[in-house]
Swiss-Prot record:
GO biological process, one term: lipid A biosynthetic process
E.C. code: 3.6.1.54
Gene3D superfamilies: 3.60.21.10
Regulation of catalytic or functional activity: Inhibited by a sulfonyl piperazine compound that shows antibacterial activity against E.coli; LpxH is the cellular target of this compound. Inhibited by 0.01% (or more) Triton X-100 in vitro.
Localization terms from the record: Cell inner membrane; Cytoplasm
Lineage, top ranks: Bacteria, Pseudomonadati, Pseudomonadota, Gammaproteobacteria, Enterobacterales
Transmembrane is among the record's keywords: no
Cofactors named for this entry: Mn(2+)
pH dependence: Optimum pH is 8.0.
Cofactor note: Binds 2 Mn(2+) ions per subunit in a binuclear metal center.
Superkingdom: Bacteria
NCBIfam families assigned: lipid_A_lpxH, PRK05340.1
Protein name: UDP-2,3-diacylglucosamine hydrolase
C-alpha cells in the first residue's frame, strides 16, 4: 500500500482538462491508497464555502467518494485556497490539517506543508500572507456579499501576477535556512511540500544527518504526486 500526496492543481472552470485528470485520479490511483493528502492550492481561488460554483460541488462529491471508499483524505491550505473552511471539508469528507504536520509513515517521520512559508526571501509576499491570515480580516471578508468578494479576489490575483512578473526566480523559491530550520524544529529527515511548482528531490543536511526535501509539481499538462511506501519515496509525473 501507499500514501499519496498532491498539490497545486489550481482547479478552475477555465482548465477543464486538469479537472478531468483529477477526477480520473480520484476514481483510480487514489482509491488504492492508504491515505490521500492534498497540500494546498487545490483550487485557483477560494472566496468562501458559500460560493455556489458548480465545480466546487462536483469536486466535493468526487473527493467524498474517495473518503467513503475507505481512503482518508486530508487537506492543508495553500496560498490560493486558505479560506477553504469546515463546510467544504465536511461536504468532501476531508480532514483539515494545520499548516505544518508531522506524519509517521512506514518508519519515517515526514513533515508536510504547502510550502509558501519557506519562501522567506520574498518579504513582500510574507507581509501580505501575514495580513490575510489575520482571523478578524478573514471574518470581515467572508461577511461581504459574494459579488464583492469576487471582485476583490480578481483584483488580488491581478496584483499578484503583476508583482511576481518582476520578481526573480530565486526570491520566489524556498530559503534553504528556512527549510533546515523547519526540519530541525520538527526533528524530521523528510519534508514534502508544493507551492513553488519546481518538482524535484533535494538532498541536504538537517539534524546533522542526510535529509530529503521532495517538491510536488503543479498540474499543468500532466499530473504530479509523491508516492510513499515502506520501501521508497517517489516523485511521479503521469498523463491526464
Amino acid at each position: 500500500m501507499a500514501t499519496l500526496f498532491i498539490a497545486d492543481l489550481h482547479l478552475c472552470v477555465e482548465e477543464p482538462a486538469i479537472t478531468a485528470g483529477f477526477l480520473r485520479f480520484l476514481a483510480g490511483e487514489a482509491r488504492k491508497a492508504d491515505a490521500l493528502y492534498i497540500l494546498g492550492d487545490l483550487f485557483e481561488a477560494w472566496i468562501g464555502d458559500d460560493d455556489p460554483n458548480p465545480l466546487h460541488r462536483k469536486m466535493a462529491a468526487a473527493i467524498k467518494a474517495v473518503s467513503d471508499s475507505g481512503v482518508p483524505c486530508y487537506f492543508i491550505h495553500g496560498n490560493r485556497d486558505f479560506l477553504l473552511g469546515k463546510r467544504f471539508a465536511r461536504e468532501s469528507g476531508m480532514t483539515l490539517l494545520p499548516e505544518e504536520k508531522v506524519l509517521e509513515l512506514y518508519g519515517r517521520r515526514v513533515l508536510i506543508m504547502h510550502g509558501d512559508t519557506l519562501c522567506t526571501d520574498d518579504a513582500g509576499y510574507q507581509a501580505f500572507r501575514a495580513k490575510v491570515h489575520k482571523p478578524w480580516l478573514q471574518t470581515l471578508f467572508l461577511a461581504l456579499p459574494l459579488f464583492v468578494r469576487k471582485r476583490i479576489a480578481a483584483r488580488m490575483r491581478a496584483n499578484s501576477k503583476e508583482a511576481n512578473s518582476s520578481k526573480s526566480l530565486a526570491i520566489m523559491d524556498v530559503n534553504q535556512n528556512a527549510v533546515v530550520s523547519a526540519m530541525e524544529k520538527h526533528q524530521v529527515q523528510w519534508l514534502i511540500h508544493g507551492h513553488t511548482h519546481r518538482p524535484a528531490v533535494h538532498e541536504l543536511i538537517a539534524n546533522q544527518q542526510p535529509a530529503f526535501r521532495v517538491v510536488l509539481g503543479a498540474w499543468h499538462t500532466e499530473g504530479s504526486m509523491v508516492k510513499v511506501t515502506a520501501d521508497d519515496v517517489e516523485l511521479i509525473h503521469f498523463p491526464f
